[in-house]
Amino acid sequence: MGFWHRIRGHVTSWAFLVPFLAFALFPFYWAIITSFKADANLYDLRRNPFWFAKTDAVTHQPYHKDIIVPASYPAAPIHWEIKQGDHTTRSDSEANPKPIARIGDQVVYSPVDGTLSQIEVPEGSTARPVDVIGTIEVENPTVTHYKFLASTPFYRWMQVSLLTGLAVVILTVLIAVPAAYALARLKFHGNRVIGIAIFLTYLIPPTILFIPFSQFVGALHVDNTIWSLILSYPTFTIPFCTWLLMGFFRSVPKEIEERALLDGATRMQMLRLVVIPVVLPGILTAAIFAFTLSFQEYVYGLTFISSTANRTLPVGISVEMVRGDVYFWGPLMASAVLGSLPVVIVYGLSLDYFISGMTTGAVK
Amino acid sequence: MAEVNLENVEKRFGETWAVAGIDLTVHDQEFVILVGPSGCGKTTTLRMIAGLEDVSAGDIRIGGRSVVNLPPRDRDIAMVFQSYALYPHMDVYRNMAFSLQLRRVPKKEIDRRVNEVAEILGLTPQLKRKPRQLSGGQRQRVAVGAALCRQSGVLLFDEPLSNLDAKLRVHMRTELKRLHQKVRSTMVYVTHDQVEAMTMGDRIVIMNGGKIMQVATPLEAYDKPKNRFVAGFIGTPPMNFFSGEWVDSKVQLGGGVKLPYPRSSPNGTKSVVFGIRPEHIYVRPSGNKGETAVPSVIEVVEPLGHDVVATASCGAGVFQLAAEIHDGLKPQDKLDLQFDMARAYLFDRDTECVL
């Protein structure tokens, strides 16, 4: 008896939970630390996927970043100088960074507002474009990758994805809620068959459907617009949400519908005042699933949209942030982290609804 | 005036008959109980009155107006469901006010009625609670309260007490009876519990197999059952039955047991079922006329307190009798039990009707 006896239940449940948590959360951990790692740390293979490091795994030197003469600078040898006092100053604000070196009349700024270590270029030496003219100690962890996103259409893609998601959710709820109620409650010929058929349509993968769909998209003249997505995403969100909602509607005690009818409600009033409020957690769940499904959709987004500005987030990231076989891991992971935020926020806000059983107390 | 008339009402589900043609009149302000075993059609009958089931044939009139083609909301009825059917997202006040709000009753009037009903049912402190925060008994009272607020002519109850524990059920039984005397609505109450039926109803309707077996006051149902089903259904412990032959004013049961049967009965020989209630079998002679001693052996004794239910056997078979604990019955006792023939019944073995 005593300590072990008391915590045995906890030990058992944690023993089951920990492997699951490790499995489920590890990708997020990796994405998050990658998005904040300086490139030097990121490409230091022995330091991956571990926590931020201060020094190189091989040389045990602090991570440095080379300062390179901009490629845009004229190719001819140039005279450049560093003014005394410039090379050790730290930029105090982003708005007014202090120059750290001058090449001719051009000024090379600190690429990040981190600590500046040394610029060891003798006075009067010449440097060509892409020459290393100094090194800078890198900031680790760093928000460089996130800042870089501002120079890409990332926020535009986010906007497209959010807008599409919202429109798809509205469309899905408007169509799936009445459909699910009819299939779950009303007795009509063939409602079982229709219910199963609706679910089967969800099982057909988009990779098969995108070619016929592109014909529709072309015929409607909505290709390369957000409308092509708003109209095609419901083809998988509606069946899924209808199926999901049927279960919720079935769990509504029939007696409270009957009581509403006896209390003087018409069928529409009964739906609006009794059934819908009771299945609200279910509708919210369906809305979240519809949002998540459309937010992460890839195939239609890739095929129906051709201009960079109209891309959705997943397509934009993978198309624009991978050049050939070069993966910009930092910005990629930064956009993955930012991209998962809307879903995390939506889930977080509605967690209480998932957990609380709204129907408790309805019957018995 | 809210008299409920059922005329040859039938209900079929496909090939099966749930209700096989019943006629019934429930008078204004009467408390009528539909009672019977499960599947006897009592709930279906109630739901047809409510309009939740269509009638397959026949007519239902409420207050003289045929309602078979009216939706439930136009029938001037309120109903209390077995599972209470409270709206889980509304507090107690809104649960009770909902039907009035739908009917656009003025806010002041709603407030007055809800508060009055809440006062009667002792729900005033709970008005702001959600159903899930209430106990089973409180939920039950909210369901009754919501029905009462309507002040409809007819109140329907579908086994409203069956989800309560035994003690609360007895208490609510009294409460509902008191309530009926107060609100004077016509009440139709469905239950499978014959004790509930006997204690609460002005009249009880005993149903079996989709048919009405008897409509009677509790006393009539107990004293003058029309048939073997009613005789066996009403009363606890249930009536004892022995099959036998009726020959020359005597009932011959198995094992050579012969009982005189004083009432006028058909002549000649007839196959009958002899029925006698446990409480009409006495341990010692009371001196009443018409008692017949039957040699028996006590097998099991079940004391309930003051009363004892004993199981005994005689030549004709096993039966139960009600005795008092001070009678001192013990298993294996051999004694002559007195059958009160004046209160025994004979049923036709084929038609099961009382003779």
Identify the residue ranges that each predicted region occupies.
Chain A
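A structural signal for multi-pass alpha-helical bundles of membrane permease subunits
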Residues: 2-93, 98-364
